[in-house]
């Protein structure tokens, strides 16, 4: 903005009034992350009021399903459903392994291994504080973690209230584990074939990977 001027209609944004994301977040999230800032937000506030912003909005966080296929990445902040998965692409079913599987396998939290949404809800809430657009968060439930394989309404209601308390702006999907593995179905559930497929993908030359060809 200092070089080329502010974006059109900048005067209609909250930024023009000197309002930053740290002024409008739900303060309950301070229970999770103390409001201690390393950046000089007050100097930034004055600079924005003086020069404007080149873009009217600065940050967003989407599930990034399509871009994750091309970039061979996981879906944004979402926990992967498995180390190996199949995704739809213009080429047809795409076999995809989580990035740096060999060195980071033990650092991944898989979606259906999670016993609840508490940690995920709090992480999204802490991020939302610094975002000027709504994060599309999801809730995921594995019935196997509950009595009679039924997710209690009280659990879902509790998650809903917790997301509101900590300042979520948008809730998107309610995912439920149905005990079906699309990848295993695709390869006829043959013993050891998942591990064989992982080995095959890991040995593939970078330029020859499925994502690179799309």
Residue ranges of each PLM-predicted region?
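Long, C-terminal-biased catalytic regions of enzyme "large/alpha" subunits
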Residues: 1-214
